[in-house]
Amino acid sequence: MAGAKEIRSKIASVQNTQKITKAMEMVAASKMRKSQDRMAASRPYAETMRKVIGHLANGNLEYKHPYLEERDVKRVGYLVVSTDRGLCGGLNINLFKKLLADMKAWSDKGVQCELAMIGSKGVSFFNSVGGNVVSQVTGMGDNPSLSELIGPVKVMLQAYDEGRLDKLYIVSNKFINTMSQVPTITQLLPLPASEDDDLKRKAWDYLYEPDPKALLDTLLRRYVESQVYQGVVENLASEQAARMVAMKAATDNGGSLIKELQLVYNKARQASITQELTEIVSGAAAV
């Protein structure tokens, strides 16, 4: 019964792993709900900021801010939002594939790329495949704050202000629902004119106090910060949803594997009993 004992050991091992994946699934489900609440709370602010900035981009401003002007593109920057932990399916790798394809498209045009990383998985990936990482922040946990994101954002905005970057993008996963998270690359700077027909029909006329430059300097920076923060909280919700789904799949696969091993064990046990009976009958016949 040496084979049967080995199979029993494998079944026990899979059952223990199944308990772990089930617990991780339940933890991820709880964290996902909290992440969704944070995402829902920050969305109205981010969307309102986007609308206000969209009106500014479509309007005839007294002062043309550098963040609103298109430039000849020689260098582009990416703020890349990844996770700090794994076991979340293909969430990170799908995002990295999309980013690499976009970087290759720019590289084919002779444009250089710089990366600011948010999340340790992105740092590890681009350190291994090669990438010009100029800033990074990791270990933000499950409740990130805007102050933790200021470092990478400040580095990229300073590079844009000094003319070392001509475009700035944010790369993150957009949360659609529990089963669907979409990798997205969104242009932050220069601010793209809104494609929203409603914004084009309803032009707003602004009066600036004290002056357009001071107001736009503050407002446009706040806009970039709000979009980055929204990208981070949506990516966090996507991470927990992907982890919950991955752990559920692992738990279900564990159950299927246990059934298969149980069947193999039963066959091995049956073969052992049959062999013992054959030996007894043969011994009795010999007597």
Curated annotation (Swiss-Prot):
Going by the UniProt record, its keywords in alphabetical order are: ATP synthesis, Cell inner membrane, Cell membrane, CF(1), Hydrogen ion transport, Ion transport, Membrane, Transport
Q: Which GO terms describe its biological process?
A: proton motive force-driven plasma membrane ATP synthesis
Q: By its UniProt entry, which InterPro entries does this protein fall under?
A: ATP_synth_F1_ATPase_gsu, ATP_synth_F1_gsu, ATP_synth_F1_gsu_CS
Lipid bilayer topology: Peripheral membrane protein
Q: Name one GO cellular component term.
A: proton-transporting ATP synthase complex
What the record says about family reads: Belongs to the ATPase gamma chain family.
Q: What is known about its subunit structure?
A: F-type ATPases have 2 components, CF(1) - the catalytic core - and CF(0) - the membrane proton channel. CF(1) has five subunits: alpha(3), beta(3), gamma(1), delta(1), epsilon(1). CF(0) has three main subunits: a, b and c.
Show the PANTHER family listed in the entry. ATP SYNTHASE GAMMA CHAIN (PTHR11693), ATP SYNTHASE SUBUNIT GAMMA, MITOCHONDRIAL (PTHR11693:SF22)
Which protein, by its recorded name, is this? ATP synthase gamma chain
Tell me which species this is from.
Salmonella gallinarum (strain 287/91 / NCTC 13346)
Gene name per UniProt: atpG
